[in-house]
């Protein structure tokens, strides 16, 4: 007898439109089946972002992140089913948790031919919200039936265009230095050139030519940052025989010439840990190495991932620090920028890799920024940037005069507990530079959980809420919103609860603080008392 597998639903939710909860990537602690039924936009799973395909099943594995970016109309219909897999192996009497699941094989499956799927998913979500044991039992049974239908349909699904597209994408990425033609790629995919072009655009959001050029420019940037190659050599290694044509294409896509780009990247700077990259970017120095992730460092990932050749792990911020130190040691940077608050072991190992400039954690972000600028001989650029920042805060205060009299409370919700979240950036930028009023005193502890009753006692006019993007927290918050205790909070009654992402509010840096000012204006400029 073969191994037996059972799938236990952890959460089922049917979304009729995009929610702020899913705009920022969230962490999956189990397999997540994402059924996209209607609407346009993009879906990100880990570091891969692609246009949403109607009637398509996406699968996010455990310990990975996912999120939606809606199109301009912002409308989407989707169902999210979180599942735990259990397996009973031959000869065993019990089911044990299984992280390696056949569910992964269902990713990007076309589900249009599964009968009454939208209705079934809506009914599943409704069953999940019922509290009776019979409803929960039926829900588990219906989930097994749905998964059976998915696997059955996948066996008879003979169309595998997406796999062919992925195969050709990989070929482009690994053969960027060679001549690549549409005829060659379509032949490799086993479909006509017209069908291939249309399918490629559908699945990637880019034309074949755009993808090839982007791949070559990204490779060129990394060669410029990692080596002392001549421009002609870089052009040849990225598929361009004419270095002058390459220069024109490079400037068109990046806004600067290859010579200017290489001049800025001559010094190989590694930004180690949180916040340090935020002092380099305003000085127009893109680091050679830095921690990047689409969830934990989303801004830097979106804007600079193609420019940074050595990408350290930012998974759960610095959870993989030992792996990062090894990567840095292999990359051989010229200098490393780090906070001095890292562990003695990290400091010792960093010191053996390269020269390290430590920023003193007890000093202010302005001191950190000016110290970084002094090290890079960019003092005048730093002074100009700070003057511009001060002008931005002055303008923001004028724009937000109508809410200056309100009292703000920053909270973070993790699992089923609230905590005060008046961190250093919030205190110095929001309450300091922007001059808003706090609903709490500066000496209130932030590690201690607080009750809804205590939150009510603060009598805050506005609540700024950091919601941890993981299943238990999201489920609790959705239930909490239906309770009388929550609805009676004055900020809730006045519709002044603002959901915030941790980025940039937990980044103590020049770039992070500029983005806090900009985000505050965006959030509050339309709020009229």
Swiss-Prot record:
Residue ranges of domain Fe/B12 periplasmic-binding in the record: 268-528
Which keywords does this chain's UniProt record carry? Activator, Cytoplasm, DNA-binding, Transcription, Transcription regulation
The induction annotation reads: Repressed by Fur in the presence of iron.
Q: Which residues bind DNA?
A: 182-201
Question: Which SUPFAM superfamilies does the entry mention?
Answer: Helical backbone' metal receptor (SSF53807), Homeodomain-like (SSF46689)
Q: Which cell locations does it reside in? A: Cytoplasm
Q: What is its main location?
A: cytoplasm
Its name, as the record gives it, is: HTH-type transcriptional activator Btr
Q: Which organism is it from?
A: Bacillus subtilis (strain 168)
Gene that this polypeptide is encoded by:
btr
């Amino acid at each position: 007898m073969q191994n037996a597998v059972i799938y236990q639903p952890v959460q089922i939710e049917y979304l009729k439109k995009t929610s702020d909860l899913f705009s920022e990537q969230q962490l999956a602690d189990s397999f997540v089946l994402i059924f996209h039924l209607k609407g346009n936009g993009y879906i990100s799973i880990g570091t891969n972002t692609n246009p949403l395909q109607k009637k398509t099943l996406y699968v996010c594995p455990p310990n990975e992140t996912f999120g939606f970016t809606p199109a301009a109309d912002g409308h989407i219909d989707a169902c999210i089913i979180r599942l735990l897999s259990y397996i009973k192996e031959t000869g065993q009497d019990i089911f044990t948790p299984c992280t390696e699941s056949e569910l992964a094989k269902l990713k990007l499956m076309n589900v249009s031919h599964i009968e009454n799927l939208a209705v079934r998913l809506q009914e599943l979500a409704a069953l999940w919200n019922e509290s009776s044991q019979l409803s929960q039992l039926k829900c588990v049974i219906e989930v097994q039936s749905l998964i059976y239908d998915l696997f059955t349909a996948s066996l008879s699904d003979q169309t595998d265009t997406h796999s062919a597209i992925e195969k050709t994408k990989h070929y482009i990425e690994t053969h960027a230095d060679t001549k690549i033609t549409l005829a060659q790629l379509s032949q490799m995919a086993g479909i006509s050139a017209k069908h291939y072009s249309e399918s490629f655009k559908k699945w990637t959001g880019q034309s074949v030519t755009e993808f090839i050029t982007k791949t070559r420019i990204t490779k060129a940037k990394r060669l410029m940052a990692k080596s002392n190659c001549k421009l002609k050599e870089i052009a040849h290694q990225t598929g361009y025989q004419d270095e002058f044509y390459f220069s024109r294409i490079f400037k068109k896509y990046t806004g600067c010439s290859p010579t200017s780009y290489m001049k800025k990247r001559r010094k190989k700077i590694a930004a180690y840990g949180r916040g340090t990259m935020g002092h380099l970017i305003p000085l127009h120095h893109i680091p050679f190495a830095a921690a990047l992730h689409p969830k934990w460092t989303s801004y830097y990932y979106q804007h600079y991932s193609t420019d940074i050749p050595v990408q350290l792990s930012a998974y759960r911020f610095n959870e993989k620090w030992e792996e990062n130190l090894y990567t840095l040691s292999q990359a051989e940077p010229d200098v490393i920028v780090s906070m001095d608050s890292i562990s003695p072991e990290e400091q010792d190992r960093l010191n053996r890799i390269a020269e390290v400039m430590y920023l003193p954690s007890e000093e202010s972000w302005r001191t950190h920024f000016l110290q970084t600028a002094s090290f890079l001989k960019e003092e005048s650029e730093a002074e100009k940037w700070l003057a511009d920042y001060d002008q931005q805060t002055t303008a923001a205060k004028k724009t937000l005069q109508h809410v200056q009299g309100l009292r703000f409370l920053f909270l973070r919700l993790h699992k089923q507990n609230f905590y005060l979240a008046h961190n250093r950036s919030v205190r110095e930028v929001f309450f300091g530079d922007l001059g808003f009023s706090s609903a709490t005193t500066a000496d209130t502890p932030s590690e201690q959980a607080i009750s809804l009753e205590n939150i009510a006692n603060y009598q805050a006019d506005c609540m700024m809420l950091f919601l941890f993007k993981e299943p238990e927290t999201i489920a609790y918050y959705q239930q909490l919103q239906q309770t009388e205790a929550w609805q009676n909070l004055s900020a809730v009654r006045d519709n002044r609860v603002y959901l915030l992402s941790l980025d940039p509010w937990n980044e103590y840096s020049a770039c992070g603080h500029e983005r806090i000012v900009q985000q505050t204006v965006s959030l509050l400029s339309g709020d009229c008392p």
